[in-house]
Amino acid sequence: MLIDQFGRKINYLRISVTQRCNFRCLYCMPKIPFDYQPKENLLSFEELFLFVKAAIDEGIEKIRITGGEPLLRKDLSIFIKMISDYKSDIDLAITTNGFLLKDFAKDLKNAGLKRLNISLDTLDHKKAKTLAQKDVLDSVLSGIDEALNLDLKVKLNTVALKNLNDDELISLLEFAKSKKAQIRFIEFMENTHAYGKLQGLKRDEIIQILSQKYQIQLIKKDEKAPVSIYKADDYEFGIIDPHSHEFCDSCNRIRLSAEGLLIPCLYFDEALSIKEAVRKGDIKAAVEILQEVLRNKPEKNKWSVVDNETSSRAFYQTGG
């Protein structure tokens, strides 16, 4: 079992398999060029899997594959199968923008993937092109349909932004309901790589908009994640509300970047590398680094909206 110095059980590992993305979303990585790591600096899937096996043996129970856009990483389904074959009951998920999903969903399911989160910020083609700086909507919608047709469990992620998609929150909720998928509205998380003029909606503003049509009822708050679950009449949806709902006291996660950096907190600059250890096949050393990262995991993150602090690490490096 993995326990940090504050007594928190750490059982959730988020793995960014690539920094690359085929979108240029305003809230994440709107400008180019980027400081991508050279390919040789990235851990191979075999190297990542050496660490994943050790992490599972130490107590990791949930793994999420992120990016960048993870479907840009060649042979991702092979990596998924490695993990699934090693521990078939692991809670294994992917977060994707959905653009390539139609082509890869079947392979991912056959490899053992059971669920995924898909970004969907708008149902309007013009807005989608503005947000992603690319004509993406038809491909994303096709990817959603393909995943659902394969009986993969789908959650839709929507970053709620003022003057961009705030007039679509109800229609997005209704779209998700029609697809029998859960939608999760996300408070915009400030970071130094986002377009500077963006303004996000807070939880109460999201609820206020949805309340124009629906009776909104709080069902529960997840004590291990910044998500609150609500009902709009008979439909359950989520709000990921890091501004409004501090969950540091029960945080259960660490992050691994594509180049092998173990990151204790999204809003914490310090990180340690497992690259040398796994490339030598030294699992004992990798586990010792993991334990040191847990000792370094802060009690609270350094993010304060009041103090106008933002993340200096790009989310495309860590998966958000």
Swiss-Prot record:
Ranges of residues in domain Radical SAM core: 5-225
Reactions the enzyme catalyzes: GTP + AH2 + S-adenosyl-L-methionine = (8S)-3',8-cyclo-7,8-dihydroguanosine 5'-triphosphate + 5'-deoxyadenosine + L-methionine + A + H(+)
Binding site for S-adenosyl-L-methionine: Y27, G68, S119, M189
InterPro entries to which the protein is assigned, alphabetical: Aldolase_TIM (IPR013785), Elp3/MiaA/NifB-like_rSAM (IPR006638), MoaA (IPR013483), MoaA_NifB_PqqE_Fe-S-bd_CS (IPR000385), MoaA_twitch (IPR010505), MoCo_biosynth_MoaA/MoaC (IPR050105), rSAM (IPR007197)
Chain sites annotated for binding GTP: R14, R64, T95, K155, R253, I254, R255
Presence of the UniProt keyword Iron-sulfur in the record: yes
GO biological process, one term: Mo-molybdopterin cofactor biosynthetic process
Enzyme Commission numbers on file: 4.1.99.22
Details of cofactor binding: Binds 2 [4Fe-4S] clusters. Binds 1 [4Fe-4S] cluster coordinated with 3 cysteines and an exchangeable S-adenosyl-L-methionine and 1 [4Fe-4S] cluster coordinated with 3 cysteines and the GTP-derived substrate.
One Pfam family, short name: Fer4_12
Keyword vocabulary terms for this entry: 4Fe-4S, GTP-binding, Iron, Iron-sulfur, Lyase, Metal-binding, Molybdenum cofactor biosynthesis, Nucleotide-binding, S-adenosyl-L-methionine
Subunit structure: Monomer and homodimer.
PANTHER family reported for this sequence: MOLYBDENUM COFACTOR BIOSYNTHESIS PROTEIN 1, MOLYBDOPTERIN COFACTOR SYNTHESIS PROTEIN A
Entry protein name: GTP 3',8-cyclase
UniProt gene name: moaA
